A protein has these predicted regions:
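Alpha-helical transmembrane segments of integral membrane proteins
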Residues: 2-13, 80-85, 151-157
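Membrane-interface helix-boundary motifs at transmembrane edges
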Residues: 31-36, 69-81, 147-150
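Interfacial segments of alpha-helical transmembrane regions
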Residues: 63-99
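Non-transmembrane, juxtamembrane loop and terminal tail segments
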Residues: 200-214
Length: 214
């Protein structure tokens, strides 16, 4: 199930890339090459960059259930999740040094906070994929899998709001948010399968698909 979903996402990515490339070239000509990319959210929804701080505040809502959770954590499960997060960070690092966005990001300036962003949690010119959405999606999947949270509609709805707001606040391009989903799902499935002593990444392991489809 998850393997089929990822294949569909790959096809959708190829088609959307071709479409957005064409739109981007037209936009570059129309604006005399002042803008050489096209983003469906940036071009059609309001600019909320002045409310960028709400982006981090909304992420805090995903952390809260873990702070107030009074149950017992399984040490093996926690170890598996840590491995999964490290793999995601490794993939993120690989992408940030190899994927260059077409225009300079205006929110990166040479002050202390953004210096940390460039050297530890992000870069000055590369944003793929969204760390906020990846982390929030990870918390939702872990919470549902281990019973820390239960309302799927609420949390996936809140996750969609976080993704939309991250694009509207100009923190990310839309593709950064979309790419976070298959990456997190793939490595969540892999780590849960490994913790359950499965031999394959997708075959025989139904932990991630159950969370998504139920």
């Amino acid at each position: 199930m998850l393997f089929i979903l990822i294949l569909l996402l790959v096809v959708a990515t190829i088609v959307s890339t071709a479409y957005l490339t064409e739109k981007g070239e037209a936009l570059a000509v129309r604006t005399n090459y002042q803008k050489c990319h096209y983003d469906i959210v940036h071009e059609n929804l309001p600019d909320l960059s002045d409310y960028h701080w709400l982006y981090d505040l909304l992420l805090g809502a995903f952390v809260a259930p873990y702070i107030f959770y009074y149950g017992t954590y399984d040490a093996g499960a926690v170890g598996s999740v840590w491995v999964w997060l490290v793999v995601c960070v490794f993939i993120f690092r690989c992408l940030t040094i190899s994927v260059t966005i077409p225009t300079q990001t205006t929110h990166v300036k040479r002050d202390f906070g953004n210096w940390l962003k460039r050297h530890l949690t992000g870069t000055a010119h590369d944003l793929c994929f969204s760390g906020h959405v990846s982390f929030a999606f990870s918390l939702v999947l872990v919470g549902l899998h281990f019973g820390i949270i239960s309302n799927r509609v609420l949390w996936f709805g809140l996750l969609a709001c976080l993704g939309l707001f991250s694009a509207m606040s100009r923190s990310h391009f839309s593709i950064d948010i979309v790419m976070a989903v298959p990456i997190v799902m793939t490595f969540f499935d892999w780590t849960m399968c490994q913790s359950a002593s499965k031999d394959t990444i997708f075959g025989g392991c139904d932990c991630a698909p159950d969370i998504i489809t139920m």
